[in-house]
Amino acid sequence: MTEAAPDRMTLVLGGARSGKSAYAERLIEACPAPWLYIATAQAWDEEMRVRIHEHRARRSGSWQTLDVPTALPEAVAAATGPVLVDCLTLWLTNLLLAEADLEAATDALARACAAAAGPLVLVANEVGLGIVPDNALARRFRDAAGRLHQRLARDADRVVLTVAGLPLTVKPSRENP
């Protein structure tokens, strides 16, 4: 399936294995290459190594991959062409584990996204649809993710929720309705 070129900033949300990354890749691939894939995942275990390998194997040679566990605002600010960030959820996890200031990091990322030089597609897991977590750390993470998503959705030109591989437009674009 071919997608229309993305707007200046598109936020793609969805659950685990919902098809959000593949959809985001199709959006960026509608732009002239080369494309930059900013990956935030860290291979903590074998399952993550396999997931990272699968994601990389799916992409063509026109993609450049930049592994950025925590310095995401700086990487977005330095990019000069079409960028896919996958994913904000793991970036937030990395920051939480590093005991970083999540509010300051959210602000820095929002500023970098607003000033991005080219089309930007951001991917994140929607984690706020389930039950209330039973521990403080998980609740803090869920709340921080919700605040991050709200901030970026407000600034985004378009917001899409992927469910079962289907993109559902939550915030339509004026340019690509």
Regions found by a protein language model. Name each.
Residues 1-10, 78, 115, 172-177:
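Short, low-complexity, intrinsically disordered N-terminal peptides in bacterial proteins
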Residues 2, 10-78:
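Conserved P-loop
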Residues 11, 84, 121-123:
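Structural motif
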Residues 24, 55, 84, 125, ...:
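Residue-level signal for inorganic ion chemistry
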Residues 35, 83, 158-161:
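Short, well-ordered beta-strand core segments
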Residues 54-56, 82, 138-140:
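Short, hinge-like loop/turn segments at secondary-structure boundaries
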Residues 57-105:
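Helix-adjacent hinge/juxtasegments
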